[in-house]
Amino acid sequence: MEENKVERPTMKMLPGDEVRQIMWRFAERYDIQMAIAGARQTARSVVARLVANGQRFTHEWTPEKQSLFDAFDASGMTAATLNADCGGLFEGPRNLAMSLVTYETAWVDNGAATSSFVNDLAMGPIAEMGTPEQKTKYMTLCAPGNPSGKTWRGSFALTEPLPYVGVDTGVLCGRVSVAEWKDGEEPMLRVEKRGRFITNIEICDYITIALDSGDERFKGSCMVVVEATDPGKFDRGAQTKKLVHQLSNTGDPVIDVVVPASRIIGGYTVKDGVIVPNLSHSEIIAQVFSKTRVGVGVMGAASLMSAIEPVIRYQRTRFRGALGVNEGSPRHALGLQMKEDVTQRLADVWATAEAASSLGFDISRVYDRIEAIQDEAKEKLGKGRAMLKAMKAPMEKAVQLLAEGKNPEEDEDVTVRYVYLMAIANVLCPSCKLWNTGHGADVMRQAISLMGGYGITEDCPGFLFYKWTDMQLDATYEGPEAVQRRQISETMGNPVFLAQVEAWAKECEACPAADRNGMNALAAALRLWAWTRDFAATAKDAAGKKLGASQRHGVVFPMADALAGLMAAKSFHADVKHLALTGGDHPVVGPELESYLNTFNDLLGTIAGNVAGEAARICAEVVFGFNAADAEKQAEFCALRAKVDVSLAGTKIAKDNAAKCLTTVMIPEALDYPM
């Protein structure tokens, strides 16, 4: 590849709403745009003032913090979590909408975003799996301005105190038993639960609780809705002394109440004198967490993206006002940006932020498409073992279509579309949570370091230090990194997904800018990863232990880490490609499309080079580190690895270009929210 000798136009200002609406696919969704406007106004006024006025200095839940919920109600953020027929904002699936609203709030503070987000989490079991009566009752009560005169708030309690908090969602110490069961009447249930680190418990009016049977008259596990006024003990517990997320309330409740059996989420039947829930707690959790984890990943992406402008401003103004630094001089105009180290490192932060955002909104759109067809597909596929058997044929067809270069999502058979989308979602969702919050927190530390000593002060512009510390909790919220790695390691071997990996590799190679935006490197890395996964699935180490065994975390977990980064770069490429195909017709974006694409492709090359190199390192450790590969396999691997190395050509030029753009891109004179 030849170095660029002709100056290319680059991004003149940081991307605005017009660009983001195209890239993230909501240019035609006026309802989402209005919801974003409400969330942005709330975040950059009410939320920002709370942070600036020191409300993060205490873990106690104050009246000032409580005002957040009034602001959420007034802006439409509360209604965004509800069905339209119950006072909600959106008709149909709303995963993308909720992710975008969460993104806007987390742009300022992740704790405030969590306070808004937790209502969606609490309502999740009811919205996804509840009976029609349960959905109508609780969604109506949670709608601002409902007939009761009070907007209900929710909470969610899954696991128990140590040692299993947030890790093993199958371990439940909460118990449900029959308190009273009169002939011809509805059974009354005793619910006993001790929760740990339960968000929003201080103010919730209801809580969705996961329980296991403590009575021979009750079979299996379930989830139950408990209201704060139910007879018995509803002790909200002491406030958790958190060092992060201080704009959300957290406690360790002790609950021992009696509720009617109609509160069992999803309903129940009675068989031979035994209450049998229609849904186990794990069935509900699998459905809910598969989507709500994305919101946490999006929070990490927003934190990263919000750091770009404050760091640029700090770098450029660092020496202004100093003796001898005259207006018009390079030092006055560029400050620290006269040296490339700071812009090179910031380019890494920016590229990571773009990829993390793209990954979060990519999986959000996938879930919207799944919701549109899942009822029809599940009806055809059946349940349990019958469903597993019925999925075989559509999975085989999806693999065949991908091999032929066709899109299974366009197939007329709804079951083919469903198994295809689920194969992708089951990897992208935990990848978003893992990469955006885990790797994202590491990259956020780089952003903090670029602010010098200012970065660890209370008045750091953009509240960057708070965001960095908040991201430590984000990485464990709704399951720590081990949980995400575990899910990826279990789902990345799906033959439909593996066929899609090859299809993505071909798509990357077909990119017109593949020789300069890292797509050749990404394609080579995807193939290297797939080969290594197949190798590990059958290879054994010197002790005769299989490398790819599900409990061999020293192998499958690093492979999950590698895949998550590759998925982020893949999603970013899809967004840049969509902008290239559709942005030209936009009256604002069109005239500047070339400059936007040049810079986005430079950022894409930056992140593609990073994740491809990391994936190659991990794969090499798997193949060579356990002495499991014979000479033939080593040669195969080395040939694929060499393709990755050669394909990195141009990725550092892309990073140079992205770094240079950071010295010229225009930013506002000051942040649009208080410090």
Go through each PLM region and give its residues.
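Amphipathic, small/basic residue-rich leader segments at the start of a protein or domain
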Residues: 1-117, 137-147, 368-412, 416, ...
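Glycine-rich phosphate/cofactor-binding loops in nucleotide/flavin-utilizing enzymes
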Residues: 2-18, 101, 414-419, 443, ...
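A glycine-rich, basic-preceded beta-loop-alpha segment at the flavin cofactor/substrate interface
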Residues: 16, 253-292, 312-337, 497-513, ...
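C-terminal helix-coil-helix/basic helical segment that borders enzyme active sites and/or dimer interfaces
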Residues: 51-59, 354-433, 568-609, 613-631
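N-terminal glycine-rich flavin-associated loop
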Residues: 113-135, 139, 164, 179
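A short core secondary-structure module
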Residues: 186-236
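Flexible, small-/acidic-enriched active-site or ligand-binding loops
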Residues: 232-266
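C-terminal amphipathic alpha-helical interaction region
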Residues: 513-675
